[in-house]
Amino acid sequence: MELKDYYAIMGVKPTDDLKTIKTAYRRLARKYHPDVSKEPDAEARFKEVAEAWEVLSDEQRRAEYDQMWQHRNDPQFNHQFHHGDGQSFNAEDFDDIFSSIFGQHARQSRQRPAARGHDIEIEVAVFLEETLTEHKRTISYNLPVYNAFGMIEQEIPKTLNVKIPAGVGNGQRIRLKGQGTPGENGGPNGDLWLVIHIAPHPLFDIVGQDLEIVVPVSPWEAALGAKVTVPTLKESILLTIPPGSQAGQRLRVKGKGLVSKKQTGDLYAVLKIVMPPKPDENTAALWQQLADAQSSFDPRKDWGKA
């Protein structure tokens, strides 16, 4: 298989720290989110970015990847072999084991006992809207074929139609029994594990079972109260902004969060007061009238007090 340049995909350098890589991931995930991107290959680019993040965000996997990338042009690194726990070892590691195996050639020539096939793990990107209901998904992956020494000889493309249940969460694992690699000598097949990755949303942040959305309001809407249209995962609603609202105030919308078998979360609208552009002469006069009318108000009266 082709070894992808995950750093190039993320637009970062191999020396960058995790914080820099995470920032790049969030930016690209939002850029290529199919709900907002107009690019024809947005979904493919989004999945590629998610794949790169899955490796570079894990310290051990990133170190293994860096080593493989460093030696990618070495013919000895054209193959890998795997243990059942999912670990991968390069050809140099294999040399020691290879000599050990041939030292026991007589025993290897006997009939080996039945052995269970290897499990396979793949990441599935799910959009927030898709978590509300059960939906079908076509999954494509490569089924490795191992030789007697645990080394991959070839990979066979495989496609499955699967159901992703409603209420799946980030990191949740879904088991598809028997869809891993075939067993040896009559042993059972391994399993396929789907690891759910909830894609970042351009509007909503996940907080447990709840969702948060930042709602921009004008100063007069915050002061006088208003009704504003706010999106949810299903449809738009009319949110009441109470008079005297403050920046950062959280307004709860019950039952509009994430759905699971046990509970349904809420949506929290976090108010953000947005000032109008630089005022003209008439607008400045109105602001001055307001300032004169509220001259006794000191917003910093309790500032810094415990």
Curated annotation (Swiss-Prot):
<dbReference type="GO" id="GO:0009295">
    <property type="term" value="C:nucleoid"/>
</dbReference>
<dbReference type="GO" id="GO:0005737">
    <property type="term" value="C:cytoplasm"/>
</dbReference>
<dbReference type="InterPro" id="IPR018253">
    <property type="entry name" value="DnaJ_domain_CS"/>
</dbReference>
<feature type="domain" description="J">
    <location>
        <begin position="5"/>
        <end position="69"/>
    </location>
</feature>
<keyword id="KW-0143">Chaperone</keyword>
<dbReference type="InterPro" id="IPR023859">
    <property type="entry name" value="DNA-bd_curved-DNA"/>
</dbReference>
<dbReference type="InterPro" id="IPR002939">
    <property type="entry name" value="DnaJ_C"/>
</dbReference>
<dbReference type="InterPro" id="IPR036869">
    <property type="entry name" value="J_dom_sf"/>
</dbReference>
<dbReference type="GO" id="GO:0051085">
    <property type="term" value="P:chaperone cofactor-dependent protein refolding"/>
</dbReference>
<dbReference type="GO" id="GO:0051082">
    <property type="term" value="F:unfolded protein binding"/>
</dbReference>
<dbReference type="GO" id="GO:0003681">
    <property type="term" value="F:bent DNA binding"/>
</dbReference>
<dbReference type="Pfam" id="PF00226">
    <property type="entry name" value="DnaJ"/>
</dbReference>
<dbReference type="InterPro" id="IPR001623">
    <property type="entry name" value="DnaJ_domain"/>
</dbReference>
<keyword id="KW-0963">Cytoplasm</keyword>
<keyword id="KW-0238">DNA-binding</keyword>
<dbReference type="GO" id="GO:0042026">
    <property type="term" value="P:protein refolding"/>
</dbReference>
<protein>
    <recommendedName>
        <fullName>Curved DNA-binding protein</fullName>
    </recommendedName>
</protein>
<comment type="function">
    <text>DNA-binding protein that preferentially recognizes a curved DNA sequence. It is probably a functional analog of DnaJ; displays overlapping activities with DnaJ, but functions under different conditions, probably acting as a molecular chaperone in an adaptive response to environmental stresses other than heat shock. Lacks autonomous chaperone activity; binds native substrates and targets them for recognition by DnaK. Its activity is inhibited by the binding of CbpM.</text>
</comment>
<dbReference type="Pfam" id="PF01556">
    <property type="entry name" value="DnaJ_C"/>
</dbReference>
<dbReference type="InterPro" id="IPR008971">
    <property type="entry name" value="HSP40/DnaJ_pept-bd"/>
</dbReference>
